[in-house]
Design a protein with these regions (language model features):
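Catalytic domains of cell-wall/extracellular-matrix polysaccharide-remodeling enzymes
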Residues: 1, 237-315, 369-373
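Terminal accessory/targeting
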Residues: 1-213, 303-304, 311-380
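Conserved hydrophobic/aromatic pocket- or pore-lining residues that grip, position, or stack substrates
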Residues: 131, 233, 279
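Metal-dependent polysaccharide deacetylase catalytic core of the NodB/CE4 family, i.e.
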Residues: 134, 138, 158-162, 185-270, ...
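Short acidic/histidine-rich active-site segments
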Residues: 232-233, 289-291, 360-365
Length: 380
């Protein structure tokens, strides 16, 4: 099979017209006109001689590289790019794995052109990414920290939480977050896989990890890592200092006695390309942070893992990005069980049709023994 990609076809080969983005130097604002093609959005329109009426490669690169996040934007209070500023949100395709849908059409055109047998797609999988910003709600904290956190809750009129904390500290009750492994056993009999990302860093304004010096905390995290793949939740502080990121990674590696190859960014503070450059420089091979904190959908418009392309260096990196389409906060925001289930099943069926993986992010708070989580867990 012969294919060409450029301005004009060379002969009777499979021709894909280029719009020029992939040959440009640097990152510059791009004027994008979105149109409808076969019932889905497309952009970077090309000549009628092309097998697809748009530059599939340039459009996919624009979305997957997060080109628009290199352009100056108005950050939220944590310095994050907001979904409302994205092309996907503006043109109502944030909830679509658009690149995967395009690729499905591209493969169909390819096999039809060369009269090839149907392409055998990969098997659809579901994986839970369980974030652990704090292993326990009240256990293993110093009396000083317990006192001031309790005082803070009391000042905000959270009397139930204040009383619950007191009962746990006095050992009249178990911590509400105890028994994570027992809860995860329910998924062992299903086709769902899972992995943990635990915050294990110095206490900070946005990082509420239990003490890294607590022997019991260390033992619990080690037990988790023996049960399922476990990696660090990179601290918020590490987004400002690469030295802190390396300390977090080395500390976690020393704890579980394994090299660290995967990571997730706490608070999902991603700054392109700095965050992913720092991960790559620290030896990280897999990132699980590609999502928006407050909006469900596909931040990079794909559900499939992909190698991150650094636009600043104009090269592909060894870092593989694993996109997440839903998180606990997205599902809970629906409030009612029916709407929760509709949201979950909507994404699930969409990805099953494309044989694409589905990654859902939870926190260990999902399995809080004192919360009314039965409806939410039933959705999963």
């Amino acid at each position: 099979p012969k294919m060409s990609y450029g301005d004009v076809p060379l002969g009777n080969e499979f021709f894909m017209a280029a719009n020029g983005l992939l040959t440009e130097q640097g990152v510059n604002p791009v004027d994008i006109s979105v149109f409808e093609w076969e019932g889905m959005p497309a952009f970077f329109a090309t000549s009628s001689k092309s097998q697809l009426p748009f530059d599939f490669f340039a459009a996919a690169c624009y979305l997957m590289s997060r080109y628009e996040e290199y352009i100056p934007y108005a950050p939220d209070d944590l310095g994050r790019f907001t979904p409302e500023q994205s092309l996907a949100f503006t043109h109502n395709f944030l909830d679509l794995p658009l690149i995967d849908m395009w690729f499905d059409r591209f493969v169909a055109a390819w096999t039809d052109f060369f009269e090839l047998p149907p392409f055998k797609p990969p098997v659809n999988t579901t994986e839970l990414v369980v974030e652990i910003p704090q292993l326990y709600a009240y256990k293993y904290k110093t009396l000083f920290r317990s006192f001031f956190e309790g005082l803070y809750d009391f000042g905000r009129l959270k009397f139930t939480r204040t009383f619950d904390r007191l009962m746990v500290v006095l050992r009249f009750r178990e911590d509400p977050l105890i028994g994570l492994i027992e809860h995860m056993e329910a998924f062992r009999s299903t086709a769902v896989s899972f992995r943990f990302f635990a915050l294990y860093t110095a206490l900070g304004v946005h990082d509420k990890s239990l003490s890294v010096f607590s022997k019991k905390h260390q033992q619990e995290l080690k037990s988790l890592s023996d049960y399922a793949p476990t990696a660090p939740l990179a601290s918020f502080e590490s987004t400002q200092k690469s030295q802190t990121l390396n300390q977090d990674i080395n500390r976690f590696s020393g704890l579980i006695h394994r090299p660290i190859k995967a990571i997730r960014q706490h608070k999902l503070v991603l700054r392109f390309p700095d965050t992913y450059r720092a991960f790559s420089s620290s030896g990280i091979k897999h990132d699980y942070s590609m999502q928006y904190p407050d909006s469900p959908g596909f931040r990079a418009s794909t559900a499939h893992p992909f190698r991150f392309f650094d636009l600043g260096e104009e090269q592909q990196t060894p870092l593989t990005i694993h996109p997440i389409c839903l998180s606990e906060s997205h599902i809970r925001a629906q409030q009612y069980a029916r709407k929760m289930r509709q949201l979950f099943i909507g994404y699930q069926s969409r990805l099953q049709k494309l044989n694409a993986p589905m990654l859902v992010a939870l926190t260990n708070e999902t399995f809080n023994n004192r919360s009314k989580n039965a409806t939410f867990l039933a959705t999963l």
